[in-house]
Amino acid sequence: MSILEHASLMTDEIRRVPLEELQTRLARFREEMEKEHPGWQMAVINNKVNMYYFTGTMQEGALVIRPQDEILWVRRSYDRARNESLLPDIRPMQSFRTLAEFYGTWPDVMYVECRKATVDWLNMLRKYMPFKEYADIDGLLCSLRLVKSSYELELMKRSGAIHQTVLEQLAPKMIKEGISEAELAVSLYTEMLKRGSHGIARMNLPLGEDVIGVASFGKSGLVRTAFDGPGGTGGTCIAVQSIGSPFRKLKAGRLVYLDIPCGVEGYHTDKTIVYYFGDINKDPNRDLILAAHEHCIMLERFAAAMLKPGTVVEDIYNETMKQFDSRFAAGFMNGGKFLGHSIGLTMDESPAIANRFKEVLTEGMTFALEPKIALSGIGMVGSENTYLVTANGGKALTGSPHKLYCIY
């Protein structure tokens, strides 16, 4: 395929973020900046997720926003940025020197994404744009992304539909004796790609990295990882704490823990489902396994019912934990102190459903609820689904939690 043919293919087949969507986001950004930082003069967006949120493209460069204008400066790839983004003002840059020559003068305070910016990037920015100090806007950006538009929700609904189809309808057909954790995870991931998943799970956490998610059989689900989540895996090797082992094969009498991410055009949904391979009635731990799993289902449903406008986030956690059966305390969330998390352009958006989070819910927010219990010597049970905050409580986007199904 020639370069011209490739360019034509991109133009014909990509689905751009609508201009009115970008304009609304930029207007909300300026409104919130004026509230929190009256008199602000300039902000520089460098993180690719935030760049995508405001411009509809992910490139190496900088989005410079001022009260009167916004310009997307692109080092690489300028042509791709022009093709993908409907933002009117997109310009090429060689380095920050290009910006220095264009703007000429600088505010005393530059607003940047401190959590994502490297020291090297900040030093380079300050070298060519000698502002006196910088201030953080990560919290402001997070709050903007928290409430989803109808456009964003449509993408999440599409992702949720893929999630439900693959993990509820297709997974039982793939779970067979002798399959490895890695093979099962990859097979599920492939089915998601076929149906339109964008193929990656983006994280806010610096150490967060994931593509396929996790498939764990039995006790391997108890192996804790560096990632701040309840589910575990031995991974493919020491260097990769994800996917699952290519050598651990499924045998009868094991729990099958599946936490496989999905997303459409940048927007994610989160879902975990647990199956039992074999006849659970022959398992000496049958009653414990079923009781723990059903308890997680109850907790998820209870928390989901509280996902209404006006509810304080920490109240969801505290009220749900009042329903918690203390006999499962040792393994609940594998030691974590949360029930779920906001989700959208990244899997682990803030706030978490946990104590001391004071945010008040509004319609359009989306959360993943994931009560899970680690059963010592057995494996992980529980559930996870993504919900939309509505006046009637959480509306499931990925399907509802269900009982533990046995696969023979």
Positions of predicted regions on the chain:
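Active-site neighborhoods and metal-handling regions in enzymes and metal-associated proteins
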Residues: 1-408
